[in-house]
């Protein structure tokens, strides 16, 4: 399906004022557009959602939406980027960071699972859209593949440390993304869920040590509170 493109009359200027007071969370119109699009894409489908409907949900004119995003595909790309870019940045730091591989993978798994759990909308469900197979979204597919490779490299290092099964190296990435299916099944997550996933990821790679130091270090690195009942 082709992308909706910017009308010539809408490309000039900085967009018209809002039709009414903001209806969406976010401090900028761009954030509010992304929130509305995320709800519509995840709940009603990408193909059936028009830019006009997104604009209506935000309370702006369609021409104002085009000031922020030239096409509907650009909106989808921005939403998808928010699910991988921060984890990819953190993962790149952790690959060359200090500490055991188990600690570094634990940090990445908790951080990545937290953002997938905490998002207002289940954006990971958009990974299965047929539109993502087109050339337009090749850069996103590449970034996600790079994140998967970061997980694999850290997992390989954990396996080497712990004498775990080499065939399990891809499983931590899959375990973290299981959050997407959990949310799709309308199962409400808990604050401890990312930590449980991170523990499972390490155990499946052969780690059988004490998790308390890992939890403490991960919480400190991410600036978050550890679960009330930390993994053992």
Residue ranges of each PLM-predicted region?
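Arg/Lys-rich, glycine/proline-spaced intrinsically disordered segments
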Residues: 15-20
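Amphipathic alpha-helical segments used for helix-helix packing
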Residues: 104-107, 115-138, 152, 170-173, ...
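Amphipathic alpha-helical interface segments
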Residues: 36, 40, 111, 175-182, ...
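Generic hydrophobic, amphipathic alpha-helix propensity
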Residues: 29-37, 54, 79-87, 91, ...
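Helix-turn-helix
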Residues: 32, 40-74, 78
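Hydrophobic alpha-helical connector segments
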Residues: 78, 92-118
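C-terminal peripheral helix-coil segments that are non-catalytic and often amphipathic
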Residues: 1-14, 148-161, 181-232
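Amphipathic alpha-helical packing segments from all-alpha helical-bundle domains
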Residues: 88, 134-174, 192-199
